[in-house]
Amino acid sequence: MHRLADYIHYLFSSDKEFRRKLRRILGFYPREVSVYREALMHRSLNYHRQGNQKKDNERLEYLGDAIIEAVVSDILYHQFPGKKEGFLTSVRSKIVQRSSLNRLAKETGLVDLIQSTHINHTHNSFIPGNAFEALVGAIYLDRGYAWCYRFFEHRLIGKHIDLKKVAKEDDNFKSRLIEWSQKMQYKVVFELVGENIVDT
């Protein structure tokens, strides 16, 4: 029923092309298109604007950053039930780091929708990832947390984010460090800096 309503809304909208492009990325038609347009506006556009005309994606970027961390934490918590906090935190940091978000923005085609005065904004080290965060913030305002989770689960995990590969890289870090140190003839010392004791 929701899909039918969204499609009818799409048919009678004045910006079908933009909605269609967003649907290819999101997997659903957006409702509040204006918030997605704002998510794709880089602050460089404000150079020639004044007063209330100034608008950019930085507030949505702030919101999206928090939502992404929550969604990824949620997904990892359920995907790896036997893993400790340190492992989950390490894997999450790799997924949400700037280089990963830049890659997601490029692979999903989001970079083609970004509005910026920078000619080569696709190569800027911040713009694509920031826009991706803002996009997730827009999804949250438009549809809520569940749809942000769905976006990651159905559109990103597996296709653009290989959880098993990221987890394996984390599991193998210690062994790779030892292997590298032996090759370079360095001595690596592992020292216990803390221990959690649970009372029974």
Where are these regions (language model features)?
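Double-stranded RNA-binding/processing signature
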Residues: 1-200
